[in-house]
């Protein structure tokens, strides 16, 4: 049976998040590779006691990249089969490209650190915000954003599952949208603890700089189909892949469509490759035919391989 691998983005990090892979030297070695490139000990960070440090986007992005690549390498090391397709949520798209051998891991580490710095500097602290709107239709959320903008930016940026949409933009506009969403019958409107309003048009200046940086990065033809966030399609051409990564910074993550497209293609089963179980849970909520596993420790990897 064909299956897809999903790679998580920011928000799935936690202290001790790789404890389930203590026996896999390859996992720590992968973190050591990334640490050597950045001149920082990422392994010590995730095994320390300061959750705030790993929650800073400049650290979270390389940590989550290393985690996803490490788990994928551990899976292959013990004889796991190649997935039919891969996709990553936001930052996870870079991990997916590494897994598909389109992007060198060392290049990806540098790129995601730069991506984080560009995102952080595009919008000063306190100016932007993000919030999750639960219990409304996608189109309702889009409409409320348009009505609440009042000359500022507020956009629907993550379509995570039916009834779960994340918005981002100027803090005041996000606040107005949250209030209007509650009035419109949203079950909840929750501010997210992030410093950067990802995937909205406030990220365009960062995207322009990312495009410059990508000019010097080699992208090879993917060996596995990579479904891109911005378009919900796969590309073989390096130029198109780079363009998709640039547009991803200021375009919505179309996760609901991604899962549905794979199910329509006969790929209903998926495994989340990295810490956390967010994407595995979303798959089941998006499509009743979808089945999601989470490879959160060595035992889960073994169980998944035995079942496939």
Identify the role of each PLM range.
Residues 1-140, 192, 269-299:
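FabD-like malonyl-/acyl-CoA
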Residues 10-12, 38, 100-251:
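Alpha/beta catalytic cores of group-transfer enzymes, especially the acyltransferase/condensing modules
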Residues 76, 182, 263-266:
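Non-catalytic positions within long, well-ordered alpha-helices that form the structural scaffold/packing
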Residues 174, 280, 302:
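Short alpha-helix immediately C-terminal to the canonical SAM-binding loop
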Residues 231, 291-308:
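Short, flexible loop segments at boundaries between secondary-structure elements
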Residues 246, 259-263, 280, 305:
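Generic hydrophobic alpha-helical scaffold/packing signal
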Residues 251-267:
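A short, acidic, amphipathic alpha-helical segment used as a generic capping/interface helix at domain edges
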């Amino acid at each position: 049976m064909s299956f897809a691998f999903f790679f998580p983005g920011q928000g799935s990090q936690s202290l001790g998040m790789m404890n389930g892979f203590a026996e896999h030297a390859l996992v720590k070695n992968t973190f050591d590779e990334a640490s050597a490139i950045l001149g920082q000990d990422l392994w010590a960070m995730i095994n320390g006691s300061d959750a705030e440090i790993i929650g800073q986007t400049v650290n979270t992005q390389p940590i989550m990249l290393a985690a996803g690549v490490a788990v994928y390498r551990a899976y292959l090391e013990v004889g796991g089969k190649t997935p039919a397709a891969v996709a990553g949520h936001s930052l996870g798209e870079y991990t997916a490209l590494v897994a598909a051998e389109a992007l060198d891991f060392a290049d990806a580490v540098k790129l995601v650190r730069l991506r984080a710095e560009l995102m952080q500097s595009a919008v000063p602290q306190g100016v932007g915000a993000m919030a999750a709107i639960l219990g409304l239709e996608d189109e309702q959320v889009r409409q409320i954003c348009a009505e609440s903008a009042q000359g500022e930016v507020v956009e629907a940026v993550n379509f995570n599952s039916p009834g779960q949409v994340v918005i981002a933009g100027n803090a005041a506009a996000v606040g107005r949208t949250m209030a209007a969403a509650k009035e419109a019958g949203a079950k909840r409107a929750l501010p997210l603890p992030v410093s950067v309003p990802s995937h909205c048009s406030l990220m365009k200046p960062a995207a322009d700089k990312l495009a410059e940086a990508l000019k010097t990065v080699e992208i090879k033809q993917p060996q596995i189909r990579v479904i891109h966030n911005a378009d919900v399609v796969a590309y073989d051409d390096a130029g198109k892949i780079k363009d998709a990564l640039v547009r991803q910074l200021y375009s919505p993550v179309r996760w609901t469509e991604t899962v549905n497209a794979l199910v329509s293609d006969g790929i209903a089963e998926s495994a989340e490759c990295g810490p956390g179980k967010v994407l595995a849970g979303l798959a089941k909520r998006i499509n009743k035919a979808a089945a999601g596993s989470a490879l959160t420790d060595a035992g889960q990897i073994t169980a998944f391989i035995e079942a496939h």
